[in-house]
A protein has these predicted regions:
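N-terminal beta1-alpha1-beta2 submodule of the flavodoxin-like/Rossmannoid cofactor-binding fold
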Residues: 1-101, 137-151
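Short, charged/polar "capping" segments at the starts of alpha-helices
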Residues: 13, 120-122, 154
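Short, glycine-/small-residue-rich phosphate/pyrophosphate-handling segment
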Residues: 105-145
Length: 154
């Protein structure tokens, strides 16, 4: 299975630790690629809709090559720290740009890893979980897991 991991954290902290643990368990049976949005040049989606008449985003940046990788994957793993009760801006920007080819993402397997500075019964995790459940329902994803971590230490 081809797995794409979108690392929504620019830091080498708890999210990277969780990604590495996932990769350790999955690497011998799968092809895994990690996308680091903070290392890419991806402009914010302008909502222009031109992408609906073309074969992808018209911005001359890293959007189309990034979405190509996501569209080619069998599974997408979204990994994010909690930023103000939501996913990180880095991850959200990649998700927003998926609009240009959204229906090509139908029927995939998905997973979510979230790390925050509050206990896992805090509403912040529920808010993020609901966002991914809505995306999964819309795109007919098989949501394999959603795991939240109280990131008190690595």
């Amino acid at each position: 299975m081809k797995i794409v991991i979108i690392n929504g954290s620019a830091r080498k902290g708890n999210i990277l630790t969780a990604i590495n643990a996932f990769m350790k368990g999955a690497a011998d049976r799968n092809a895994i690629e990690v996308i680091q949005p903070d290392k890419l040049h991806i402009s914010p989606c302008k909502g222009c809709g031109v992408c609906q008449c073309h074969k992808g985003c018209v911005d001359n940046d890293d959007t189309n090559p990034t979405i190509d990788k996501i569209a080619a994957a069998d599974m997408i793993l979204f990994a994010t720290p909690v930023y103000w009760w939501g996913m990180s801006a880095q991850l959200k920007q990649v998700i927003d740009k998926c609009y240009c080819r959204g229906m090509q993402l139908k029927g995939k397997k998905a997973g979510v890893i979230v790390a925050g500075g509050s206990p896992v019964d805090n509403i912040q995790y529920e808010l993020i979980r609901k966002q991914f459940e809505c995306m999964a329902g819309y795109l007919s994803w098989d949501m394999l897991f959603q795991k939240s971590y109280y990131a008190t230490a690595r």
